[in-house]
Amino acid sequence: MIEVFLFGIVLGLIPITLAGLFVTAYLQYRRGDQLDL
């Protein structure tokens, strides 16, 4: 039961982590464009 619980937490954190990295990279990309302009 504990292994299944930890596995569920990992599966839940992976999409959140990927989404956070994507948003951070997107904001930095937009910020870079604004500085270039």
UniProtKB/Swiss-Prot annotation:
Pfam families: PetG. It is found in: Plastid, Chloroplast thylakoid membrane. It comes from the Eukaryota. One of its GO terms (biological process) is cytochrome complex assembly. Disulfide bonds: none annotated. Keywords: Chloroplast, Electron transport, Membrane, Photosynthesis, Plastid, Thylakoid, Transmembrane, Transmembrane helix, Transport. It is a single-pass membrane protein. The keyword Chaperone does not apply. One of its GO terms (cellular component) is cytochrome b6f complex. The chain crosses the membrane at residues 5-25. GO terms for molecular function: electron transporter, transferring electrons within cytochrome b6/f complex of photosystem II activity. Belongs to the PetG family. HAMAP family: Cytb6_f_PetG (MF_00432). The 4 large subunits of the cytochrome b6-f complex are cytochrome b6, subunit IV (17 kDa polypeptide, PetD), cytochrome f and the Rieske protein, while the 4 small subunits are PetG, PetL, PetM and PetN. The complex functions as a dimer. Component of the cytochrome b6-f complex, which mediates electron transfer between photosystem II (PSII) and photosystem I (PSI), cyclic electron flow around PSI, and state transitions. PetG is required for either the stability or assembly of the cytochrome b6-f complex. This is Cytochrome b6-f complex subunit 5. It comes from Spinacia oleracea.
